[in-house]
Amino acid sequence: MDDQIQRMKVLGAGIFSLMLALGVARFAYTPLLPLMQAQAGLGLAEGGWLAAINYAGYLTGALTAASISNLVLKDRLFRIGMVVAVLTTVMMGLTTDFWVWAVSRYLAGLASAASMLLGTGLILNWLIRHNHRSELGIHFAGIGLGIAGCSVAVAVMSLWLDWREQWFVFTAIACVLLVPALKWLPAPDTSTLTRTGAPMHDNPPSPLFMRVFMAAYFCAGVGFVVSATFIVAIVNRLPGLEGQGSWSFLAIGLAAVPACIVWDFIARRTGALNALILAAVLQIVGILLPVVVGGMVGAIAGALLFGGTFVGMVSLVLTMAG
């Protein structure tokens, strides 16, 4: 029983860290983007640059994380990243200076990599070491919960608060999420044995496979960052859908909550690589649907497909990487 309680606390730490770094620090920007354009003078081009800078921060963090094998260092950087996620959130509300926003978005990208990659790696290591199934479906529900929560929060807060005040509310939420994200994740065990005394195996794929794999993952990331950042603005500009973009973002979050559990199930039956290919194909369809089909049906269907695949792809990739 104690082991199951500890398992749920570890998974809870991962969920709260993803809600903090991805949901608040990263994705609160998406539903707030139209509001910042209307109230803070943020131009469409500048909004795009901020999204690109955020992805550059994530990419920098991802490359850095890939070069780190020391569990203690991973744990330290993860915890620093969670604090940075809170600081970057408050930075967005303190000014209307583009360059301060740019620094905030870059650091938020680093923080999201700390949660997505370092935090997930630490949790995966704990699960394997304690002889639990090395699947991350419950853990990655945090991304969907964060997206859906931010979407609802912005819709409600916009009735009373301006863009700046909403960033400050998100900062308060981030402070609350920070506590379990740090407290419930135990310090890493650096031994080479599992809890039962079995050796920890590391069987990485070939260098050629990893080069092709990372190139494909990079392309998927580019498509993801554009769609995830601008989905609200894109839907708002489609004929007949003015003001309806927030519903698409909410659909993405709701679809993302159970997505990894579903893809874990699919991967057990088809293999992780086949499941990843299927998810990529469905994500392409989801990105194109709002434009090709049009209307609210196309927007919501596309959002559900996108939300149901992008987190699953990350989970599958990290599970394959071990």
Predicted regions and their residues:
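Paired small-residue
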Residues: 88, 99-107, 297-305
